């Protein structure tokens, strides 16, 4: 079957940096044990499973602060999504060693909220409720930040302030953010806009918006918890008009999706391991509806091939 390898796709620099830091931590025998990750280092189960094989424990919970309360000793890794100042404070009070893998793009948003809230600004923050990135950003100045996920949330806002900044989670759909920000500006014309969609998210979405038009179907390889992966599928359907499915790996492909399809576009979320995506591409390229031997997807990528190679610090 014909495959369009939508490019750019896959890992962004923030994800790679986070995984390298976590892997260096796993191999650094000087760091106190056990080593924990507060949440998923990046939103991909294959990656977290691979780290567990290296002895790193991924902790889950309703929020980062509650997760950290489970930890009494050792080392904690802050994920690429960032954490609130309250989490940093508690880690320090507990005497824990901290490895900070926060994406620099996320840190920039935290700095904006910290600096401008001290000047009396209120914030309208466009983000996904329940996602760790907004949790960390809002935690910088919770009394100044209002989280909105859609236009309806904007309509229900009641902010009395002359100084307002509208900003956003880095991995949102740029089209959704634009629509929500437009509505917010109509309601609060005095507001300033600081669009914080990261470049990696933006160019991957634009690639899908353009290249998916050439395809009958688009497959997005990414974890269900990965917001940027889910947004890529949304962009394919809503902007390019091409049906899309998000899958975790090759085993989730369904044969009926390919009925009447000649060209399949494949892209991947920013936290999706490259070998997982390559396996999906290879399967679809070999798939032939007239040859039953090509119909059964099988995952052969081992966890050992998931994580980036790192130099052991001596």
Curated annotation (Swiss-Prot):
Family: Belongs to the IspH family.
Pfam families, per database record: LYTB
Example GO BP: isopentenyl diphosphate biosynthetic process, methylerythritol 4-phosphate pathway
EC assignment: 1.17.7.4
Protein name: 4-hydroxy-3-methylbut-2-enyl diphosphate reductase
Keywords: 4Fe-4S, Iron, Iron-sulfur, Isoprene biosynthesis, Metal-binding, Oxidoreductase
UniProt-annotated binding residues for dimethylallyl diphosphate: 43, 81, 131, 226, 228, 271
NCBIfam families: ispH_lytB (TIGR00216), PRK01045.1-1 (NF002187)
